[in-house]
């Protein structure tokens, strides 16, 4: 077993009818383990979330349904490997075994966490890969470049290849 702490951080969702009951169950279970901490954060807790992610070794996003959850991109951008449920937009952000791990069960998440905590070099490598992946695919600079290339292509309709110099 690894010497670690689990921090479950987030806020309530008004559009989640089961959320309050699930939260109660999580708090009840967490109260039995001194290494599990539940943090209920108010809206606009960006600084706290930033500090938690930066201080983490691994970021988890074990949703059973999820759009493009920013938790995953935030973790990757900060150089943390992310363990996430293989659902929705999470699958667009985690490259399994390259930037983190896609999992299908709590047991799978636990196994991958032990693997990462036992292998700091793998943790570092996945974190670096994740940061690069976010830089190349999800930052606004990438989108600006794509739009500039589109405008250049429209301005040069006969050319097959259009490039931006230095980008």
List the predicted regions and their residue ranges:
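Nucleotide-activated donor-binding/catalytic signature segment of Leloir-type glycosyltransferases, i.e.
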Residues: 10, 19-47
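Short alpha-helical segment that forms part of, or immediately flanks, the ligand-binding pocket
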Residues: 50, 73-77, 91-92, 98
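Short alpha-helical donor nucleotide-sugar binding micro-motif in glycosyltransferases
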Residues: 50-56
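A short hydrophobic beta-strand element within the catalytic core of glycosyltransferases
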Residues: 59-60
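Aromatic "clamp/platform" in nucleotide-sugar-dependent glycosyltransferases that forms part
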Residues: 64
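Short hydrophobic beta-strand element within catalytic cores of glycosyltransferases
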Residues: 81-84, 94
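A short, well-ordered alpha-helix in the C-terminal region of glycosyltransferases
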Residues: 115, 122-136, 143-149, 153
